[in-house]
Each structure stands twice: as C-alpha cells, then as structure tokens.
C-alpha cells in the first residue's frame, strides 16, 4: 500500500499517492499538510497492482461537467470517458477519445461546485455513473499519482483556482479573434493574394490567412515550395499591406534527410525507442523523426527554429497532427488489408506512436504511454518560447491537441469535423466542454472540414450559413475545408447566401470589443469567453439540459439556430432580458419564440462595448473593457475610471430617458429608436461620468 499525503492551500487540496512523476509539475504555493482525510474529501482510493482507482459518490441530482473535448452531452453522467489523444478525423457524436485530454471534472451538487483534477497524461478512464450508478470511478494506470480537489462554491471559483494551478491563459492579439480563412490548401502565392483581394473587394474583413502543408517543399518543416511560393517575403508583405496576417501550419515530423538542416541540427533531440535507437516513423514528409519535446534542450532547439521562421514576417503558427500522430502502423495495416479480397475503410487506422517509444522528462526516461497526452502541451510551450525568443509582443498559436495547461500557450480548435446537421450541434457541445475545462480560446472549422470522400457530408448552403452563425461568438472564427470539399469562402457562394454570411461576419466585428474584453478577463481570471447557461445559473437544474444556447460572458445570451428551421424557441434563465433586435424586455424563466436568424438577448445588469467606440448599458453593473477602462452604471449615472472616447451610447431602460449630461457640462438629447431603447450620439471623450435624465 502506497503512502497517501494530503496538502492544502486556499481551497485546493493536493492528494499525493506514493512517489508520482507527473507529466508537468504544478507546484501548490505555500502548501501545508492538511488535516482533512480522504473520507472528508468524499473519496475512496483503491490500489490494484500498477493502477490507482479513485472513487467518489454520485448523487441522483448531482451534475458532472468538464473533461474537455468530449462528443457527448455537457452533463457527463452515465457515460465512460477515455483520456487519450488521437487523430480522430471525421469523428461523430459519442466517439471517444478525440484530440484533447483535460482530466478535470467539476461536480455541482446542491448548487455547490467542486473540481477534481488528475495530473496524469496516461490513459486515464473516467466512469461517471455507468458501471456503478452511484459512483464516479477514475482509473489511473500508474502505481503513484497526484490529483487535486478544488473547492468552489461557484464553477468560476473552481476554474479560477484550476488556472491558478495550471496557468492562466495567454492574451492573444485582438486580430486573432477576427475572421480567418483557410483551406487544405491555398496555393500558389499569387492565388492567396488574389483571394484576399476578392474577399476585401466584396466587403469581407479578413484578419488572417492560413497556409496548410502544401506551402512546404516536399512537406519539410520550415521550408517554402520553390514553385508554389517562390517569393514568400513578397507574399507576406502583400498581405500585411492589406492588413492581413499569415499563419502557417507546422507539424511535428522532421524529414530524415542528411541535406536538411533541422534534421542535422536536431540530432540527439528526437524521440527514441527503448533500445536507444531513433524512433523513425512516417508522416507527410515520408521517413520522419519526431522532436522529444519533453527534453528542455529540444524545446530550446525548437524555439530557435520557430524564431527563425517568424523572422520572415510570419504572424502565427498552426500546430497540427500533434496528438502525436505517426502513420507507420497505419501504413503497415493498410498494406495487409490491401492484400485481402475484402475492402476495409481505413480512415480510422492506428496512428499513434508505438509502445516502445520513450521520452526524457526532467532527466528521467519515461515510456510514451505514460506521458502521451502532454506531448502537444510541451510542443506548444516550445513554440510559445519561439515567439518570445523573436521578441514578438503578439503571439498566435493554434493547436489541434492539448493537455491541462494548454491554455497558457494556444488556441484549440475541434479538428477534422464533417459537415452535417448533427455535427453543427456537436460543435457547440465540444467548444463549450473545452471552455468549462479551463481552455477559453476555442473554435471549430466553420463549414465542416471533410470533403466529398465522406458520404455523410451535407454541402447545402443553408448548413454552411448556419455554421457561420453558430460560431458567431466563438473565440476562434475560421472557415476551413479539405481539398475535395466545396468552397466555404463566402465570395464563392450565390449572392443570397454571400450576403447572409457578410451580415454575420460584420456582426461579429461589431461585437469584437466585447469578445476581446472577455479575452482579457480570461487571461486574468481563467473565466471562459463562451459558456453554457448553467455556468451562470448553476443552481437551476433546468439549465443543464440546454445545449443549443450559450452565454458570451455574463451578459449576452445567444441561441443559434442549429436545425433546418428559420425560427426557434429560446429558453431564457431567470432575470430580465433585452431582445437586441426589437428592444423587447422579457421576464426570464420563460420560453420565447425568436423569428430572427441570430437570436441575441442581453441580460439586465450588462455593459457591452461595441466597435466604433459604442456602448450599450442595461441596468446597474460594472465592467472592465479590453483597454482596462472600468465602467460602472447605476440607475441614473454611468462612471468611467479614466478618460475614454464614446461615439454612441445606447441605454436600455423601461423608464424613459430624455437626455444625458456629460461630465456635468454638456447636455445631449436622446432619441428613442425602438421600445426600451434610447440612443445618444456623443462623439467625444468622457473624463468622468454621464448622468441620465
């Protein structure tokens, strides 16, 4: 029986069984031995050989949320979940596992939230009331382990403490939340600039362009294809002239080639097998070796490569295939299957590293299976350091895979989804699951990635438009499509659908100051940008059943239409809600019908900064804008912590407002534009306050 020790600090309890060697060290500051016992924490521990099993009771009305990227309902009860990063192309609902492993779940019992985080990057299994109806059973395939119990009482309290432990999210630049376009793949380089010109001519604001693997020379990392991209500096300059950023894909496989500089400089820094030989696999470049990102010297080397690449003017890095994926065994299996008289689908063949791969972590040799899920975390860490080495103030990294702590370095997107009405709904569940697991900067491939090779796809224009609408407030907003898919860039759509997408994209830009203010809050406190309704109303059991609406911060409720219908019923939680489109104020705990294509409701007690220095104020509250200006509203006054420029002020009120007085001096008349909506055109700097009369 291994020894069990419990430490505590500020509502976080660290349970240490034996002498664990965690994939990443999360030191508990000022930890002290706790007087609490396991039973007082509500836990039972069973040690079976090389496994540790942790059990907690599960009440009938208890809710279990979190666990990251899972293709299931957000209330995780009555299912079993595996933490094991895989290349899950063309995944569907209830497929598990997927690309990201976040071994954190949050229990909400009698309105009180408690978090449970297991710091293991091996294949941890969470059984949430499936095998035994009244238990959560966590099986860790290690004889020593550490985990944390995190007290709330609110869900946001748990996430604040969890991200204090694992790291607060980085703050990306504002452009990273703009509209991005991507394709597998855009080339040659003249076509890239031509596409941007077409988009801008048609009135679409493009924040960034992504280049997939075809920009490389023979798929070798940190190279440009000599014919497709003969003048990369010219390409970058042309995009920057148009205020468009360039983001390039960077996989993890280094081609075995004695004339290839990264292969030569990386010798001694690649993954090995148990015999001490190099692990040689197969990836896009062909015969491939893989950086052992667990080694500090490897991360330094990789940071140097990234820094050199960025020095050309590249603005962002897109990390793909980093579960990590290797094609060796898939190729071997495919060769066997091809010799058989029966045909098999091979799109989900084994693409993981073999069992005999080893890594070197903090000077210790460890098996791949023990740390697999943390591989993308260390890759993102090294890539982030590359930005720092290049003295970049603006950092943009997008990663497909991740582990606890990935929020410190990267955005996450949900991988290779398949366009369908079922997937449309699933994407919301996936991004919300990540959001409430400490990963605030998330998104999906708008339009669905997979192309015509998949019979299940739906290429209807209505579905494509609703993908754009679904993701309206997702932190990461990018269209992306496979080589054999339809064009998802709106300029190639019929005029009717093109204009619909334009309205959606422009609305996103209108709300971008609010979204970016929430990004600042995420970086400071660990709060999600978008969140399920139950995050704000955790003591209301009805909210745990709502999976087709989401909150954007505390103040905005969005109910995308995720069916073929043109209207929908919207569940409004308790409180008062303002219909953004017609000014109606509605009492909550109600269900209303929305006929607008983009149902948006503002919660009483909200301040929403909009593009063009506009503000919407509804009720009494306070809010910190992305520029750190504190805005506080009461029944008859709006105060500002410092001087800011306001072009237009929209006041939502059931009581009439006739005029405002700026800084006790300038009187401005107010126009009623629709019910409960009063607009003042200010167009000046405000030093201190606005009075409402």
Swiss-Prot record:
One of its GO terms (biological process) is carbohydrate metabolic process. It is found in: Cytoplasm. The active site is at 320, 323, 416 (proton donor). Keywords: Cytoplasm, Glycosidase, Hydrolase. It catalyses: Hydrolysis of terminal, non-reducing (1->4)-linked alpha-D-glucose residues with release of alpha-D-glucose. The keyword Cytoplasm applies. Its EC number is 3.2.1.20. InterPro entries: Gal_mutarotase_sf_dom, GH31_Enzymes, Glyco_hydro_31_AS, Glyco_hydro_31_C, Glyco_hydro_31_N_dom, Glyco_hydro_31_TIM, Glyco_hydro_b, Glycoside_hydrolase_SF. GO terms for cellular component: cytoplasm. One of its GO terms (molecular function) is alpha-1,4-glucosidase activity. Belongs to the glycosyl hydrolase 31 family. Major soluble alpha-glucosidase. PANTHER family: ALPHA-GLUCOSIDASE (PTHR22762), HETEROGLYCAN GLUCOSIDASE 1 (PTHR22762:SF120). This is Alpha-glucosidase. The lineage of its organism: Archaea, Thermoproteota, Thermoprotei, Sulfolobales, Sulfolobaceae.
